[in-house]
């Protein structure tokens, strides 16, 4: 049986915040992604105040083979709670294959989310009108300047 995976590429703290509260103290949330090295260290450190406030333990595991590993995990049904994909196209594929949990299935105010973020960022985590996640970072790989 497939375990649905929640993708989150800025929504992570919003979603975890919605899960906050004493009733979840001691619970662990697992996250995997492609952040490694100092990026991984910084990402882990960013959740320390959240853990102190809520008691929810956030466990992040980064890998330079994330894309291959997450495919194997999805196919086996042994997925983390959250995944940070570096490519939006991979999110589309995972959603189309039924591996992702729509944010509407969680206690997330999607109207507020869409008001708070640009339509472009919302679109990165949307597949066929269903929102599965959102961008926590963007990289500019190239740019073309034109001045007439």
Language-model regions: role of each:
Residues 88-144:
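Hinge/lid segment of periplasmic solute-binding proteins
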């Amino acid at each position: 049986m497939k375990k649905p995976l929640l993708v989150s590429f800025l929504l992570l703290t919003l979603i975890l915040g919605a899960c906050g509260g004493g009733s979840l103290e001691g619970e662990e949330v697992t996250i995997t992604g492609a952040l490694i090295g100092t990026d991984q260290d910084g990402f882990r450190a960013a959740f320390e105040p959240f853990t102190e406030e809520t008691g929810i333990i956030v466990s992040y595991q980064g890998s330079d083979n994330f894309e291959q590993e997450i495919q194997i995990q999805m196919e086996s049904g042994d997925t983390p709670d959250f995944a940070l994909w570096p490519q939006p196209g991979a999110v589309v594929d995972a959603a189309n294959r039924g591996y992702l949990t729509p944010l509407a299935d969680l206690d997330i105010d999607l109207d507020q989310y869409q008001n708070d973020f640009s339509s472009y960022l919302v679109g990165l985590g949307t597949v066929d009108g269903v929102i599965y996640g959102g961008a926590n970072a963007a990289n500019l790989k190239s740019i073309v300047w034109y001045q007439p």
